[in-house]
C-alpha cells in the first residue's frame, strides 16, 4: 500500500469518526456506562433571544417591557403583510417596518419568503439530501467544519450542547453546501450565517436560504467567499471613495499610514455582522440586509467610520487590523433602535448622493457586449453602454454586477456545474431594451421599489397561521428527529447512484480531538437528553408579562 492509499484511508476513517460523533448526539465521547446527568432547567437563565446566561436574569426593566409590548403589537401587522404579500412586497412600508424590527415569531417566515426557499425546494426535490450524503462521504474540509461548528453560537440554547441536534443540522448544511457549490466550498463565515438561519428555519429551508443568499445578485455575498472576490474589490473601492468624500481627514490618515491595504473594513463588516456584536442587533441588521440587499453594506460601514472618526485618525500602523476590529465593535455597543435610526439616515443620504452602490465596472479589453444599467437607485438617467459584460464562459455562479441593476424577470434557466442554476434575465418590460420610464427618470429612487417585482411570489393558498410557517413559534423548535437521516435517504442515494451503497454503519469513534476549544471541557461531560431543553416558554405572549402588564 503506497503513501497515497494510506493517506486516503486515514482521511476516510477520520471523516467516519466525526460523522459518528454527531450521529450519537450528546453522548458522543462519553463512557458507555456513564448515566445521564439530571436535566437542568434554563427557564430563569435564558433571555427572549435564547442566549443562556451564567446567572439568573433580573426582572424586566420598564424599557424592556415596553419593547416586548411593541413587538407583540407589530406581530399582527407583519402577519397581515405576509398574508397579502403581493401588495406589500414593493411598498415602502415593508422597508419602514424592517428598520423598526421584525417580530421574533415572524422572522423565520419572512426570511423564507425574502430568499424564496419554498420555490427552490419545489424545483429541487430531494437535492439537499443527496448533497448531504455526498458531503459525508467526500468532504475535504470536514475537520475545519467540525471545529467551527463547535464554536458557533455556543451561548445560544440551541447550540449549547456539543454534538446536539442543532450542531448536527449545521454540520449537514455545511457539508451539503460544500458539495453543492465547489467554487465557494467552505469558509468559516458560512458556519455563522447558516447558524443564524437555523435559529428560525428548519434544516432544509436553512440550506436553501444559504444557497439563495450567496447566489442572489441582490445580496452579492458570494464575492466575499469566492476566490474571484469581485464583491470585496468593488465595495472596497466604493468605500474608499465615500470615506474620502465625507471624512477626508480620516482617509488621509489611512493613506498616510498605509492602513487601507492592511485592514478591509468591509471584510471586517461581514464578520461583525455574524460574530462580533449582540445577537439582537445582529438579527436586526440582517433583517435590513435581506430586505435592502447590498445597498445596506455601504451605509453600515459609513456609520462605523463616522462614529470612530477620532479613534481612526489616531490608529498607528502597529496592529491596525486588531485595532480597527475592536473599534468597529465599539460602534455597535449602544441601543439597537439608535443604531437602526442612524443606519436609515445614512442610507437616505448615500442614496441622495448616489453613493449607496459602487459605480459601474469599467469595460474589459476585448469585450464588445454591453447592456444598459441605471447609475444608482436615486439616479435620473441611464449610462447606456458604460459597462461591458466580462468575456469568456460563465462561472458556476455569475459574478456580481457592480451597478444598480434594473428589475429583472426570468427568461430561461441554465444548469451550471456544481448544482447551481443560472437564470438568463432581462429588464422587466424592456426585452433587453432600456425602459423609457427608467431612461427619462422619475421620482427619486422610483425604480428602487420596482426591483421587488422580481421578488418571490407568496403561494395564493397560504395560511399564515397554518403549518406552512414551521418554526412560527419557538414551540416547534424543539422537534426531535426520530428516524435517522441515513435510513430516510438511502433510497434517494441508491436511485441516483445504483453502483454505490449507503453506508449503514461507521467505524468506532475516536477520542475527541477539539484542541483549543473553550467548550471542550464541558462538552466531554455533557450528556443531556437528546431533545434538549424545551423552549416553549421563550415565545412572546402577553400572559408571560410581569404583574401589572
Swiss-Prot record:
Q: How does it sit in the membrane?
A: Lipid-anchor
The answer to whether UniProt assigns keyword Acyltransferase to this entry is: no
Presence of the UniProt keyword Ubl conjugation in the record: yes
Q: Which SUPFAM superfamilies did the record assign?
A: Ypt/Rab-GAP domain of gyp1p
Which GO MF terms are attached to this record?
Answer: GTPase activator activity
Q: Where is this region: Disordered?
A: 350-419
In which tissues does this protein get expressed? Answer: Expressed in liver, skeletal muscle, kidney, pancreas, spleen, testis, ovary, small intestine and peripheral blood leukocytes. Overexpressed in prostate cancers.
Chain ranges of the Rab-GAP TBC domain = 101-293
Give the record's PTM text. Ubiquitinated by a CUL7-based E3 ligase, which leads to proteasomal degradation. Palmitoylation is required for membrane localization and protects TBC1D3 from ubiquitination.
Q: What cellular-component terms does GO give this entry?
A: early endosome membrane; plasma membrane
List UniProt keywords, sorted A-Z.
Cell membrane, GTPase activation, Lipoprotein, Membrane, Palmitate, Proto-oncogene, Ubl conjugation
Q: Where is the composition biased (Low complexity)?
A: 398-417
Covalent lipidation (S-palmitoyl cysteine), chain numbering:
318, 325
Tree of life domain: Eukaryota
Q: What does this protein do?
A: Acts as a GTPase activating protein for RAB5. Does not act on RAB4 or RAB11.
Q: What else is known?
A: TBC1D3 is encoded by a collection of very similar paralogs with multiple copies of each paralog, some human genomes encoding well over 50 copies depending on ethnic origin of the donor.
Q: What is this protein called?
A: TBC1 domain family member 3
Naturally occurring in which organism (per UniProt): Homo sapiens
Amino acid at each position: 500500500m503506497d503513501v497515497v492509499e494510506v493517506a486516503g484511508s486515514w482521511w476516510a476513517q477520520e471523516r467516519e469518526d466525526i460523522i459518528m460523533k454527531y450521529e450519537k448526539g450528546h453522548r458522543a465521547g462519553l463512557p458507555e456506562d456513564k448515566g445521564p446527568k439530571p436535566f437542568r432547567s434554563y427557564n430563569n437563565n435564558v433571555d427572549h433571544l435564547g442566549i443562556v446566561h451564567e446567572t439568573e436574569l433580573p426582572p424586566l426593566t420598564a424599557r424592556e417591557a415596553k419593547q416586548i409590548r411593541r413587538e407583540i403589537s407589530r406581530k399582527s401587522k407583519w402577519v397581515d403583510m405576509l398574508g397579502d404579500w403581493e401588495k406589500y412586497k414593493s411598498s415602502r412600508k415593508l422597508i419602514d417596518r424592517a428598520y423598526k424590527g421584525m417580530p421574533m415569531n415572524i422572522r423565520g417566515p419572512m426570511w423564507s419568503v425574502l430568499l424564496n426557499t419554498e420555490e427552490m425546494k419545489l424545483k429541487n426535490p430531494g437535492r439537499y439530501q443527496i448533497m448531504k450524503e455526498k458531503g459525508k462521504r467526500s468532504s475535504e474540509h470536514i475537520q475545519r467544519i467540525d471545529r467551527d461548528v463547535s464554536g458557533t453560537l455556543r451561548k445560544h440554547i440551541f447550540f449549547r450542547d456539543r454534538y446536539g441536534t442543532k450542531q448536527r443540522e449545521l454540520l449537514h448544511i455545511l457539508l451539503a453546501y460544500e458539495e453543492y457549490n465547489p467554487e465557494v466550498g467552505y469558509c468559516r463565515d458560512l458556519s455563522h450565517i447558516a447558524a443564524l438561519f437555523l435559529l428560525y428555519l428548519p434544516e432544509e429551508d436553512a440550506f436553501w436560504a444559504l444557497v439563495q443568499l450567496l447566489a442572489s445578485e441582490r445580496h452579492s455575498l458570494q464575492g466575499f467567499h469566492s476566490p474571484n472576490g469581485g464583491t470585496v474589490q468593488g465595495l472596497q473601492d466604493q468605500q474608499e471613495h465615500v470615506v474620502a468624500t465625507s471624512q477626508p481627514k480620516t482617509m488621509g490618515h489611512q493613506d498616510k499610514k498605509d492602513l487601507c491595504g492592511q485592514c478591509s473594513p468591509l471584510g471586517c463588516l461581514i464578520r461583525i455582522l455574524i460574530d462580533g456584536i449582540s445577537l439582537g442587533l445582529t438579527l436586526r441588521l440582517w433583517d435590513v440586509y435581506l430586505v435592502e440587499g447590498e445597498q445596506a453594506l455601504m451605509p453600515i460601514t459609513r456609520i462605523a467610520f463616522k462614529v470612530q472618526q477620532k479613534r481612526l485618525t489616531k490608529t498607528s500602523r502597529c496592529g491596525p487590523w486588531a485595532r480597527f476590529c475592536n473599534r468597529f465593535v465599539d460602534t455597535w455597543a449602544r441601543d439597537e433602535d439608535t443604531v437602526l435610526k442612524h443606519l436609515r439616515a445614512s442610507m437616505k443620504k448615500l442614496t441622495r448622493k448616489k453613493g449607496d452602490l459602487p459605480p459601474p465596472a469599467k469595460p474589459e479589453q476585448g469585450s464588445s457586449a454591453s447592456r444598459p444599467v441605471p447609475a444608482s437607485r436615486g439616479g435620473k438617467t441611464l449610462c447606456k453602454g458604460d459597462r461591458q459584460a466580462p468575456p469568456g464562459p460563465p462561472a458556476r455562479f455569475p459574478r456580481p454586477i457592480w451597478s444598480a441593476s434594473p428589475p429583472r424577470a426570468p427568461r430561461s434557466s441554465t444548469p451550471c456545474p456544481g448544482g447551481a442554476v443560472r437564470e438568463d434575465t432581462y429588464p422587466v418590460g424592456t426585452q433587453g431594451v432600456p425602459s423609457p420610464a427608467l431612461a427619462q427618470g422619475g421620482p427619486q429612487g422610483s425604480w428602487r421599489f420596482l426591483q421587488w417585482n422580481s421578488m418571490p411570489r407568496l403561494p395564493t393558498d397560504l395560511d399564515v397561521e397554518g403549518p406552512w410557517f414551521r418554526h412560527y413559534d419557538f414551540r416547534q423548535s424543539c422537534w426531535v428527529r426520530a428516524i435517522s437521516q441515513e435510513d430516510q435517504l438511502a433510497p434517494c442515494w441508491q436511485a441516483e447512484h445504483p453502483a454505490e451503497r449507503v453506508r449503514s454503519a461507521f467505524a468506532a469513534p475516536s477520542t475527541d480531538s477539539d484542541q483549543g476549544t473553550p467548550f471542550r471541557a464541558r462538552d466531554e461531560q455533557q450528556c443531556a437528553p437528546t431533545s434538549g431543553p424545551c423552549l416553549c416558554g421563550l415565545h412572546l405572549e402577553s400572559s408571560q408579562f410581569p404583574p401589572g402588564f
